[in-house]
Amino acid sequence: MANINFGFEHHASKLYSGAIEEGIQNSLVPMVIETSGRGERAFDIFSRLLRERIIFLGSGIDEHVAGLIMAQLIFLESEDPDRDIFIYVNSPGGSVSAGLGIYDTMQYIRPDVSTVCVGMAASMGAFLLASGAKGKRASLPHSRIMIHQPSGGAQGQESDIIIQAREIEKIRRLLEEIMAKHTGKDVQQVREDSERDRWMDAGEALEYGIIDQVFEKRPAPEKKD
């Protein structure tokens, strides 16, 4: 059976996601204490962000991570189908099937999904960054974005390997068509550009059509009279 991934995930996400998992296991996730008339309540930082309709994708993308992201998207739609959802992306990429599950959910739900790259969006991370609502995709100035073709391993009898190779090519074509739709590039251009790792800074990603704006600094709130 073919196991299709974006190849960069193999040498980038193990250390990255491992550090995240170790931090969680060591209870290093910050807690936020809120006080009300009914006393104090403690939230981990990610749950608190979820209340503000913010989802943080900060690891490699596998089936477990995708399940969490999809569940949060569907939950926030049920809370308010008319308010935007924000996904902050800092990911080296990962499983194609898991990433497509997130992608389909982003397109399926009613709220617009705004995407922001903070740090790195490589491979499937870049794919999801580009998949945000048009006009609502952004990056911080020193983030790095990378696109490339998916990779996959095949094993078994010759006939099985041929079938799996065809499936990998079919998936590659699908990903190129989706990226072309969201960036405004033609499919052949996307194929040529993603033949090898193509790294971009925020300005280059803006020019390519992966994002719509570069955030230098959050605007100061308006002063009340």
From Swiss-Prot:
This is ATP-dependent Clp protease proteolytic subunit. The active site is at 123 (nucleophile), 148. Pfam families: CLP_protease (PF00574). Fourteen ClpP subunits assemble into 2 heptameric rings which stack back to back to give a disk-like structure with a central cavity, resembling the structure of eukaryotic proteasomes. GO terms for cellular component: cytoplasm; endopeptidase Clp complex. InterPro entries: ClpP (IPR001907), ClpP/crotonase-like_dom_sf (IPR029045), ClpP/TepA (IPR023562), ClpP_His_AS (IPR033135), ClpP_Ser_AS (IPR018215). The gene is clpP. It is found in: Cytoplasm. CDD domains: S14_ClpP_2. It is an enzyme of class 3 (hydrolase). GO terms for molecular function: ATP-dependent peptidase activity; ATPase binding; serine-type endopeptidase activity. Its EC number is 3.4.21.92. Belongs to the peptidase S14 family. It comes from Chlorobium phaeovibrioides (strain DSM 265 / 1930) (Prosthecochloris vibrioformis (strain DSM 265)).
